[in-house]
């Protein structure tokens, strides 16, 4: 049995999420490429899901609204609290390469799916 870590790029995931917190208008590009399940880390899946819900309701996406939505769902502490949001925001101070990062995360997600199908 192969015990290697499945394909992932958590740096790209953090950069996407951080970029969306500082430049939410980039969500149009990202949402065309990624689904929450494409993120490797469950914390990142939850954060992206909340951002997607805010986006679909045409509500602003920022550290305050995401934190509030997570608190309402009783998930803020599950992801590690407000400190995790602040760390992610610092990881992605710009959304300049967000489309490329999204494609990297999608590619890794597809590779994980292929591995699951073939095992």
Model-assigned labels for residue ranges:
Residues 116-119:
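A short N-terminal interaction module
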């Amino acid at each position: 049995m192969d015990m290697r870590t499945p394909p992932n790029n958590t740096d790209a995931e953090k950069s996407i999420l951080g970029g969306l917190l500082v430049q939410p208008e980039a969500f149009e590009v990202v949402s065309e490429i990624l689904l929450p399940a494409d993120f490797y880390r469950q914390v990142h899946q939850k954060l992206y899901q909340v951002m997607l819900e805010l986006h679909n309701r045409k509500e602003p996406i920022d550290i305050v609204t995401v934190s509030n939505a997570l608190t309402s769902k009783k998930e803020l502490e599950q992801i590690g609290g407000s400190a995790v949001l602040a760390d992610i925001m610092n990881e992605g101070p710009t959304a300049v390469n967000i489309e490329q990062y999204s494609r990297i995360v999608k590619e890794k997600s597809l590779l994980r799916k292929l591995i699951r199908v073939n095992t």
